[in-house]
Amino acid sequence: MKDSQSDIIELCNKLNEATKLKRNGKSIKLTNFVSNTQIKLDSWKFLEWDYGKPSVQLPIQARGLFTLNNDTIAVRGYDKFFNVEEKPFTKETNLKTSTHGPYEVTLKENGCIIFISGLSTGDIVVCSKHSTGDRIDDNESDKTTTATATATAPTRNHAKQGEFELLQQFDGDQQKVKQLAHYLYENNLTVVAELCDDEFEEHVLPYPKDKSGLYVHGLNYNTITFKTLPMDQVLQFAKEWGFKYVSYLTYDNADELFKFLHKCSETGTYNGREIEGFVIRCHRQSHTNGDTDGDCFFFKYKFEQPYLLYRQFREVTKQLLNGTPINSIKIKKNKPITKKYLQFVEKLFEQEPEIARNFENGFDIIKVRQLFLQSLNETNGMNLLSIDSELSDQLKNLALANGNEGLSTTTKYIFVPIATIGCGKTTVFNTLNNLFPQWTHIQNDNISKKAKLKICDLTLLALEDDDQSVVLFDRNNSASRERRQIFTTIDQKRDEHLDDTVDLKYIAINFIPEDLSEEELWDITYNRVIQRGDNHQSIKSQSDENLVESVMKGFIQRYQPINTSRSPDDQFDHVIHLKLSKDENSSKSSLENVRIIIDDLVQNFPDLIKEKPADELINECFQKALDYKPTFVKNMTANTIKKDPTYYGIAMHYSSILENLEIVSHNEHFQNIKSHIQTEFHVTLGHIASSKQDKAGRVKWKKLVKTLGKGDPNKPKSALKFFADVKLLQIVINTDKLACIKVEILKIYDTNDVLQSEIEPINKQLHITIGCIPPATAVESNITLEELYDNPDEQELKPDGTYKCGDDTLHVFNFDNPDLKLFSQQLFVAYQ
């Protein structure tokens, strides 16, 4: 089964065109060399949130795609598939009507994905999801650096490990490898397997040596449309070629399927073995001429527990190893059993420091968990949840026995909107406050810029009151950095206001549907703001429409959708998704959103709303919210904003930087930083602080301001009509602190390509900060590089290695391509 070459050329053209997009379907291209050859393969991927999005039409839905010469699909993974209830089309009710059997239910093995394919040359291609062959970080064990450095341990390369496992499977028989490559090429197939080996990389479930290897779970045709072989043929292939294989079951109808899935989820096991869940393979219902043999379609059914608890154990252990006291470690759920686990681990690490060191390096994670289970005389992780419930009851009973209910845990809630101007958040929050007067509504627009107490301070002050359980945190929070600031500030200050018995939960109120385009968001919200005129504390469209337009565009440009799979949004305990109606009657949309919030809270937080308000009362309180007239006025005109820029920088293309982090993506020291990766990347040319250090700094700063201009002081960041070509030199990781990229500016030029040689960067060590682990901050990237390059006359780049600089341990990774350049990166000015 093959596509025509012209169809694949058209696909590659679309993929290449998509690399030029900024969002909504942008593709990222990586070029790899097939192992032990000079054959180039192009790897393609899209941004995670673009998959399964109705408003984004991707050229192909494959997750894991490699092409050859822009005319051949060499490797083809599965189409991206989603969990039951994760998307509208994977709701259980929809799946029962939109798909048909046979439903092949495969066990979800717990490792890293490996693709295997063959080329016409007889070469085998073994890939991870997005790379194949050698990388710069695959150091030889005897590699050395300078006298002050030690050799770094090899970073895990999944593709190379997959290749190694395959060769071992064939007892080192290279001829057998070539035979497999020939077979796959002739049949236009990609093998999809799971690499499970705890000695290489631990995940959640254990795979001892006798269970480790490549588990085949799919054979895909290398075609644009997703086509995969049925499991009986996959099993036959695996046995013929000596692979391990996943178990599977078959159900003919969806009712029997879901009955089985729900039953297994009660214990988190299948045949007495803990598993992560199942992948279900079926076909879409086709409505053409009554034919039901539709396209291949996958979905997954993941068990929530005990795997969320296992992951929480892993995360809190990292915090413990970083020196955070147990009482200060943030625990989202199952606090009693997690605290008991932490107390056990703290003692274990004191007695056996080798286990602690292994844990820091990504090993013995499962061993520690199993030792904890043994200490409780348990073998089943699901029983930990029962113990958690028992411990919780014991704490409550102890509090009652002591005549002090105050010792029991009290839950308080902060409702955090994710919105832009004009989404209706204040109307919705005013309505909720009218319905529930005991809730506190704090509007950021009512807080003066000069006020000492900001919105986070006022939130904590409100929650000090025993009678206050909810704060409506009325601010847009459109950018993820603003959400991060909420979590960070409240965590830092909560001990000044709340004791340990208060459990804080963050409820995200998402006002912007994921399928809404940027253009639609602008049209809806701008029309709403124009309609309300000056009835707002700061956004007065009747008085100054141009200023309002500028401010609104700034919010939309900074908007980053909520993504609970990564930091900081993974700290939300619950998300309520609202609607944003294109209807001219915007109040209708806001009233519907009030009802959505109430219904969700009644279902998920019954202690919060014990009795659902009557429709008449909701309508009455909503009308009162519509009649609301703000009395506080916040001056947003230009003369209230600082005229002096804070800093100048070069905005770096976000996706391009991310894709070049591949060389450290599996490095043990980078793992801790992964959850702290910044939401934007830039190179700082100069900061106003430099003008206050010495005369030379003042001269350079004034020259920057004069040459580049001040942009628009009404915006936090303003694009300038200058561009730079930037060379990426090397990645530097400061252990448990930060990661940054050392860079070189090749040239700066204006829109007419006229060189601007008079623009001189003030920063001595030009860099891009990738991410910082609190309390480290971005400014420490500069300090890190100054430590590493303490000789100002040193021109040569440090080779790969580990360097001890004072109290810091630095790890250097040079890029495989020594000529890695990003062109036409735009300069900007920032005001803070």
Curated annotation (Swiss-Prot):
GO terms for biological process: tRNA splicing, via endonucleolytic cleavage and ligation. Keywords: ATP-binding, Endonuclease, Hydrolase, Kinase, Ligase, Multifunctional enzyme, Nuclease, Nucleotide-binding, Transferase, tRNA processing. InterPro entries: P-loop_NTPase (IPR027417), T4-Rnl1-like_N (IPR019039), Trl1_fun (IPR012387), tRNA_lig_kin_fungi (IPR015966), tRNA_lig_PDEase (IPR015965). Its EC number is 6.5.1.3. The active site is at K108. The keyword Chloroplast does not apply. It is an enzyme of class 6 (ligase). One of its GO terms (molecular function) is GTP-dependent polyribonucleotide 5'-hydroxyl-kinase activity. GO terms for cellular component: nucleus. It catalyses: ATP + (ribonucleotide)n-3'-hydroxyl + 5'-phospho-(ribonucleotide)m = (ribonucleotide)n+m + AMP + diphosphate. It comes from the Eukaryota. One of the two proteins required for the splicing of precursor tRNA molecules containing introns. The ligation activity requires three enzymatic activities: phosphorylation of the 5' terminus of the 3' half-tRNA in the presence of ATP, opening of the 2'3'-cyclic phosphodiester bond of the 5' half-tRNA leaving a 2'-phosphomonoester and ligation of the two tRNA halves in an ATP-dependent reaction. PANTHER family: TRNA LIGASE. Belongs to the TRL1 family. Has three domains each corresponding to an enzymatic activity, namely in N- to C-terminal order: ligase, kinase and cyclic phosphodiesterase (CPDase). This is tRNA ligase. It comes from Candida albicans (strain SC5314 / ATCC MYA-2876) (Yeast). The lineage of its organism: Eukaryota, Fungi, Dikarya, Ascomycota, Saccharomycotina. The gene is LIG1.
